[in-house]
Design a protein with these regions (language model features):
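Short Fe-S-cluster ligation motifs
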Residues: 47-67, 286-294
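Canonical Radical SAM [4Fe-4S] cluster-binding loop centered on the CxxxCxxC motif
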Residues: 4-42
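Short, charged low-complexity linear segments at domain edges
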Residues: 1-9, 231-255
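Core AdoMet radical
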Residues: 29-41, 54-69, 81-99, 111-143, ...
Length: 294
């Protein structure tokens, strides 16, 4: 895989560390491969860190599953801390390998309290989570990983990718977070990227935002009323009710972010997430907002 140069002018500086993954999520935008790539990418990423601009605000570590690097992930984090002391680290992981407390402590410690862990929760119900993750016991291992991260006082971004198998339970997920995961730093409800496995499993997993907005509305406001920080990623403002706009983030990496012809006359375009260039089709129901009227 050819990695993009690290650049302080972009909103996405990422170290891709492996195409391997111990999950096989039904909507994965970058399906895993059985590639013997960890050592090669590790050496490549060490060099990229050494040559990176020193003013990067944040750098991502992603895959595949970064924790499959084992101790090499810790070495990578230490190298970032040494070479880029002012840069935060954002690790995207399914969280399962953080079930090992000793390993979790070492990863968190290496980051010197400047790591954000982006961890997915697919459902409050273990069966649905495991189906979506494509792996048995994924739910229990992820939950154990989340608790271990919390015990290490890690910063946790809980990610809920909305799909056909979980959108009916969005409010239940919010209640589950309140009762069982009150330590997460924030929760992000995310629109799907229509590429990779999401296309292959479209009939099973794909759902349009216009089908779940009312469920999302209830889930977001439930967490907000309980004073949990809550965000919405990857869903254009025109598809959200006006009361959800304050939660929407411009979350899409600039290298795969696009706005459509219908967006040209929209008064909220500058604040909107837009869409994915990587998606085979845009969301249904996109429209122009004039003078704030939805």
């Amino acid at each position: 895989m050819i990695q993009r140069p690290l650049d302080s002018l972009t909103n996405d500086n990422t170290l891709f560390c492996t195409e391997q993954c111990n999950n096989h999520c039904l909507m994965c935008c970058q399906p895993p491969k059985k590639a013997d790539d960890i050592d090669i990418l590790f050496q490549e990423n060490l060099l990229r860190i050494k040559n990176a601009p020193k003013d990067l605000p944040i750098i991502g570590i992603t895959g595949g599953e970064p924790t499959l690097l084992g101790e090499k992930l810790i070495d990578l984090i230490r190298q970032i801390r040494e070479q880029l002391p002012g840069t935060d680290i954002h690790i995207l992981s399914n969280g399962r390998n953080f079930k090992d407390m000793s390993y979790t402590e070492k990863v968190v410690s290496a980051g010197d309290r400047r790591i954000i862990f982006g961890i997915p929760l697919h459902s409050d119900y273990s069966g649905d989570h495991d189906i979506i993750a494509g792996c048995r016991n994924a739910f229990y291992e992820t939950i154990q990983g989340l608790y271990n991260l919390a015990l290490c006082e890690a910063c946790i971004e809980l990610r809920v990718v909305i799909n056909k198998l979980n959108y009916q339970r969005l409010h239940c997920i919010s209640e589950f977070i309140n009762k069982n995961l009150p330590f997460v730093t924030w929760t992000a409800f995310m629109g799907m990227e229509y590429t990779g496995y999401a296309v292959e499993h479209s009939n099973q997993i794909w759902v349009e935002p216009i089908e779940y907005i009312s469920k999302l509305q209830k889930a977001v406001h439930t967490l907000d009323e309980w004073h949990y920080k809550t965000c919405i990623y990857n869903i254009p403002l025109c598809l959200l009710t006006e009361d959800l706009h304050e939660f929407a983030e411009q979350s899409i990496s600039d290298w795969k972010n696009e706005y459509y012809e219908i967006c040209d006359g929209c008064t909220l375009k500058a604040k909107c997430s837009g869409g994915f260039t990587t998606s085979i089709k845009p969301y249904q129901g996109l429209h122009t907002i004039k003078n704030g009227e939805i």
